[in-house]
């Protein structure tokens, strides 16, 4: 029977993801902190933090795991037509803090958000250190959508997305896929399946298979120019 591990503030190794609980699915450890080195170690081993504002830090590695393969994100014909008509522009790493703030806004029928101030500060530090990245969708000078995540070698670990205009988050996903293909990324970790991710083409895989893919690509070199702030054209 698997048991929950408790972390202290000393830097220590995470338990194996195979030891995560089945109920709640994927809960592996509790406690610790959100220092950059601990966060990067977590993602390197297929673990991520997810907790509410009043909770201790909770670390997860669910089974199954939601993933995308770059090139297999579903950009439907109707979505392509819709996006071609929009006057939107797209950037990478131009407004990371604002994207996180957008993602942190409570959704409809939600009282709060898991993207707490503590989480935002931690990931902003990762961004400053070159590990966390954002995609932005703009209508004029207004930020209308975007997403952010962590790059580990040739793996992009998606964290959250948001939209303020219809389909803007899907546009951000299309931009991300295009960019990752150009930069030879091999895997997008989407963490937990939900209907929105499924509609975009996410697939559930066994945790062991995900860890195998992560291990295969997490140490692969990446183009040094991959995450230089830039404006991009979405090719539809």
Curated annotation (Swiss-Prot):
GO terms for cellular component: cytoplasm. Its main location: cytoplasm. One of its GO terms (biological process) is protein catabolic process. Pfam families: Leu_Phe_trans. Its EC number is 2.3.2.6. It catalyses: N-terminal L-lysyl-[protein] + L-leucyl-tRNA(Leu) = N-terminal L-leucyl-L-lysyl-[protein] + tRNA(Leu) + H(+); N-terminal L-arginyl-[protein] + L-leucyl-tRNA(Leu) = N-terminal L-leucyl-L-arginyl-[protein] + tRNA(Leu) + H(+); L-phenylalanyl-tRNA(Phe) + an N-terminal L-alpha-aminoacyl-[protein] = an N-terminal L-phenylalanyl-L-alpha-aminoacyl-[protein] + tRNA(Phe). GO terms for molecular function: leucyl-tRNA--protein transferase activity. It is an enzyme of class 2 (transferase). It is found in: Cytoplasm. The keyword Manganese does not apply. Signal peptide: none annotated. Keywords: Acyltransferase, Cytoplasm, Transferase. Belongs to the L/F-transferase family. PANTHER family: LEUCYL/PHENYLALANYL-TRNA--PROTEIN TRANSFERASE (PTHR30098), LEUCYL_PHENYLALANYL-TRNA--PROTEIN TRANSFERASE (PTHR30098:SF2). Functions in the N-end rule pathway of protein degradation where it conjugates Leu, Phe and, less efficiently, Met from aminoacyl-tRNAs to the N-termini of proteins containing an N-terminal arginine or lysine. This is Leucyl/phenylalanyl-tRNA--protein transferase. The lineage of its organism: Bacteria, Pseudomonadati, Pseudomonadota, Gammaproteobacteria, Alteromonadales. The gene is aat.
